[in-house]
């Protein structure tokens, strides 16, 4: 570590693997002073000119705008765009933009009024009096994105490096052939470059600041050295010319000796890098309150009679600039935005200049040479030797052609900087960078689809969970409503129960006597006897239950069978007794309602039926007791006792049937004539007495 630090102190530089040395072709434009492009008749400002989503519009068609007025809202990583001049917004419509696909994007069309009037400006003479967040917000609202070609929002990048940045690198390499925008900017505005560096030092507080510049820019090196006189903490490093030494990872390796890990950025090792053009834009935004509305664009190529570098407003059509440089159309026409290795052919010359447009190359037909057809890969390995990122271009090519997305991703496809070195050395003329770009786009599309599917799944699961929660809550409310009664509901229930209780008490205790008739106690006596019979029946049931419990303790199965038979007989007789009692009560009630004499007859019949029911119950009880005693003495005696009990029970049933017939006959006779009723009652009493003697001869 000490040796590494000592080497840095002595201006030591390192080298990176790979790289190529193509013809530089820079003298066509680097020796010509910069010119200011006049305003065109129409400016076309795309809403998205950076890496990230487009901003929300703040203007409408037909509205007058001033120079530097925001056209969109900038939030987060959304960088706003501004009006390059004053004028009227004639349309907000899609237009072809500077992209290899040639797709149309939403743009604001402004017709300049020629006055070029600024909005109200608030310069900051001393930026050191402002806190870091105010400076970051100023840079963000100025719409500054990386002017080196990536277009990453500068404020977001700086905010991520507020803590932990050791080395600040200013990228002045500009390694790609033909491009000289940064070269001329450093030659003519070196003081602004140094001022912008001081603003970044105030923000990031790095331990050291390094400016990396290739040795093929002697005028720019001299201008920076003059601007750095008397400046401490800023070191100029001149590096050998090699493509692509201007790459972020490659220049980091050259100046610090550190390698950025795969899948990481230079900030992961404490390094933050900014382009020279971005530094000048930061100075103008912070101190002069000028948003990013213009940039330096290199116009070069043999198809131009007067190449050079121009200060061009954002939104200026490419064809307008080409005419300023003396464009001579070729057949077939070819205009490249960017350099010959990393640029792309424009689908139309009507596309506008954007924030990342650093060069417009218009080559002659003989300058670029004839395009040769693509041939099969011969596995020579030259692409591997030329790759500055340490990748395997040959394998990535096969993965891209075979649509093996995961393998391409695992082989660090996204670490490819698309420098074009592999395609430059390929003897088979395979456009490797095009395959890589297409594969990256497909992987990003698949990732976006997967993300949308995951979001849809999450929304569906959240909805299902919400419905389940609502269902449980609804069921709980229903249960609570069914169980918990309000005070009003409880009062209603109590009132209903009270009414039923009063009705029940009144039906049992009140006896209605028709008008004009004398009360007769015979029905009351009969009802009393019936209640006594019911009580005796309940007593019999209790005795039956006790007998059943006793018989469960008997070990012999035959004894258990006999006990069960006796229990069934007792239950049957108890039910018959209850039935007889009910009939007696009903008969008594009817008799009272019709005639006192009939009531007397009905009462007599009821008394007879009650007496017979009691005798039948007594017989059943005796039979059960006898059966129990016999069962306890001997199984054979138990069987005999059970047979005798069945016979007695049968006779009791016959006697009850006879009694019922007598009662019915008496009722019919009573209905015809009182004297016949008396005779029938006497006959019934005689028959009942005989039946009782037959049941119990003792």
From Swiss-Prot:
Residues 366-397, 407-436 form the 4Fe-4S ferredoxin-type domain. InterPro entries: 4Fe4S_Fe-S-bd, 4Fe4S_Fe_S_CS, Ion_transpt_RnfC/RsxC, Nuo51_FMN-bd, Nuo51_FMN-bd_sf, RnfC_N, Soluble_ligand-bd. Its cofactor is [4Fe-4S] cluster. One of its GO terms (molecular function) is electron transfer activity. [4Fe-4S] cluster 1 binds at residues 377, 380, 383, 426. Its main location: membrane. It is an enzyme of class 7 (translocase). It is found in: Cell inner membrane. [4Fe-4S] cluster 2 binds at residues 387, 416, 419, 422. It comes from the Bacteria. Gene3D superfamilies: 3.30.70.20, NADH-ubiquinone oxidoreductase 51kDa subunit (3.40.50.11540). Keywords: 4Fe-4S, Cell inner membrane, Cell membrane, Electron transport, Iron, Iron-sulfur, Membrane, Metal-binding, Repeat, Translocase, Transport. The keyword Transport applies. It is a peripheral membrane protein. Binds 2 [4Fe-4S] clusters per subunit. It holds the Pfam family SLBB. One of its GO terms (cellular component) is plasma membrane. GO terms for biological process: electron transport chain. The complex is composed of six subunits: RnfA, RnfB, RnfC, RnfD, RnfE and RnfG. Part of a membrane-bound complex that couples electron transfer with translocation of ions across the membrane. NCBIfam families: PRK05035.1, rnfC. Belongs to the 4Fe4S bacterial-type ferredoxin family. RnfC subfamily. This is Ion-translocating oxidoreductase complex subunit C. It comes from Yersinia pseudotuberculosis serotype O:3 (strain YPIII). The lineage of its organism: Bacteria, Pseudomonadati, Pseudomonadota, Gammaproteobacteria, Enterobacterales. The gene is rnfC.
